[in-house]
Amino acid sequence: MAKILVLYYSMYGHIETLAEAVAEGARRVSGVEVTLKRVPETIPAEAFAKAGGKQDQKAPVASPQELADYDGIIFGTPTRFGNMAGQMRTFLDQTGGLWASGALYGKVGSVFSSTGTGGGQEHTITSTWTTLAHHGFIIVPIGYATPELFDVSHVRGGTPYGATTIAGGDGSRQPSQEELTIARYQGEHVAKITAKLKS
C-alpha cells in the first residue's frame, strides 16, 4: 500500500482547509493510506495568539525523520514574500540527515500554497520544488487537467503548479469551492501517481 503524507503549515487556517481537501482527494484512490500532519509552530504561543493565529488545528505535529516513512508527500505552505513560510523552511532545514542518506530519493512530491493578494503563489510552489529536487523527489504538478483552472470569471487561486487560495489582504476570504476542487484533484492526482510507482 502506498503511503501519502499531506504536510502543511497554516497560521490562519487557509492552508489547513486546503490540506484537508488535498487529503480528501488522495483518499479517493484505492490502495493508498493518507496521513495529514503539520509542521511545528516556531512563533511563541503568546505572539501567535496575539496575531490571531488559528490555535485549534487538529492535525498532529510531524517530525522531519518520519518523512522517510512515506512514498509521497504533498507540502502546503503559505507564501512569505514569494517563498515558503519560515516554519516550513525550519522543518525542511532539519532534513539534512535524510538528504545525506538518500532517504527521500525517488519519493513523489507536490506543493500547494496560499497568498494574501495572489502575488508569489506560483513562485512559492516552484521555489519549494528546489528543496524537493535536492532530495531527489519526483515532482508532480497538476497541469491544466481540471476545468476550474480555466475559469477567469472571478478571483480564484489555483495554478498548473499546484492548488492555491487567495485569502485577501486581511485574511477574511476563505478557500472557495473551486479552489477546494482543485486541491482535491491535486491530492487524487498525486496519490494515483504514487500508487502506480509503488506497485
Curated annotation (Swiss-Prot):
Pfam families, alphabetized: FMN_red (PF03358)
Gene Ontology cellular component terms for the protein in this record: membrane
Positions contributing to NAD(+) binding: Y12
Bound cofactor: record note: Binds 1 FMN per monomer.
Catalysed conversion reaction: a quinone + NADH + H(+) = a quinol + NAD(+); a quinone + NADPH + H(+) = a quinol + NADP(+)
Cofactors, names only: FMN
Binding site for substrate: W99
Keyword terms, alphabetized: Flavoprotein, FMN, NAD, NADP, Nucleotide-binding, Oxidoreductase
Gene Ontology molecular-function annotations: flavin adenine dinucleotide binding; FMN binding; NAD binding; NADH:ubiquinone reductase (non-electrogenic) activity; NADP binding; NADPH dehydrogenase (quinone) activity
PROSITE patterns: FLAVODOXIN_LIKE
Annotated positions binding FMN: 10-15, 79-81, 114-119, 134
EC number: 1.6.5.2
Family according to the record: Belongs to the WrbA family.
Protein name: NAD(P)H dehydrogenase (quinone)
